[in-house]
Amino acid sequence: MMITSTNPMVYTNPVVYTDFPDPDIIRVGDVYYMATTTMHFTPGCDILRSYDLVHWEFIAHALNIVADTPEERLECEGANAYGRGMWAPSLRYHRGTWYVLFAANDTHTSYLLTADDPCGPWRKRELDGFYHDSGLFFDDDDRAYVVYGQSTLRITELNPELSGPMPGGLDRVIAQDDPQADLGYEGSHLYKHDGRYYVFTCHFPQGKGKTEACLIAESLDGAFEAREIIDDDLSFHGYGVAQGGMVDTPDGDWYAFMMQDRGGVGRVPTLMPMRFGEDGFPVIGENGKVPHSVSVPAASCAEPVAPINGSEFIARHNAEGGVDANCLQPYWQFNHITHDEYWSLTERPGAFRLHSGRISSNLNHAWNTLTQRTMGPVTVAEVTVDASTLHDGDFAGLAAFQGCYSYIALTRRNGRTMLTVQYKPVNDDSIFSDDDWDSPAVTDAEIMADADCMRLRAVYDFTDCKDEVTFFYRDADMPESEWRPLGTAHRMVFKMDHFTGCRIGLFLYSTKETGGIADFYDFAYSTPNTKEGGR
């Protein structure tokens, strides 16, 4: 997409209708940059670029892996990093260097990523101390601080090397949320504007939805005054818009950016105009209400903006026209650390190939599951799966990948190829997990496959929290044949087990013996009836 607007354009919230949780947005020159949480997916720590705060493109994954641990590598049953990994990045640019600070709950470590160019390469190092939901801040005198915590918010000065706390430096509690709050302050960002210090933070006051608060002080060692600045759900089922910060335009206008839980699709970015009241506190949207439509600043970009989702596997070719091995489009991410000997883009030209390298009880433990974000309100994914080299007990197919997963897959049983829909049952609609990672999937429907090579389809419908996926199939050699449904609709429920929106997943796993192979090709991604304001 080419961005060449000369006049402000109006878009619908959420402006990006896909799972970009914990967004942090900054402006450098005329360009906006965003970092977002990627949890257990690799490569991680997505860095995106925009010229208008609405149309975003990937420019880097700042993080290859969090840590080379059995959990991050899915090395054994019961050991995983689901819902943990890379959390809540804080993105900053200061004196020629780019910074991302984040914490990982599985390693209980904070990490600092640095780069000379936001497109990379990025360097990683550990910090002394653990800074939950941290916000990095550089003051006018170049001293660095971090605001962090859950319920109790602290500000700690960092040493000049940014390797840990400054000996004798500022280290203080700035706020303590109401102990009766359903969830205390977290997701904090620290700014300075007109000589005042601003902390944006979110919480769940007792008996209310998620809201955004702002704390203001005249100095970092002074008293912070708190005020609610957003208490609104965009008329969407009580899901509060909160957790984010503020960014200005080159013309001096201000916007607040926040995420909103949107059920199965995940946590999505919203955008709203902002101004400062006479008392200095931000005034968000329309008297604290998030507008359904937002006018964004004019932008001009000479280069096309790359899509944030799509149908291609391969990102680039080499000078000879061949494929650069292991070079996927940036909208693809693997579940956990990859086992590179068991996947390929080159063994079968045009196909993504998976080899079975371990015995797994279910999809949770499959190595190298390749994922892509879904997008609201509806996403359709199609792929052709060649199962001619599966072994008995292998499953290869197309998933609605989340804690309570479901999928359509080809499987081999007693030398015959079957087509099956399986799922992990949803016990309730709460966000809490049952922590059952190991039980086999439940079969919803199963038939004899017409052939070893089948075209599979999944329709992910998030319309008004419908949050259902349905599966279809047809013969891969008969592209004009009608799609035939298989099984029933399955719920896509956002839970804290994965703590991410439902993703498309291409997978292979074995329940009896390793060595099977599955090829995936002619993948197609579409978003029918999607309105502008996202993509």
What do these predicted regions represent?
Residues 1-535:
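Carbohydrate-active catalytic/glycan-binding domains of CAZyme proteins
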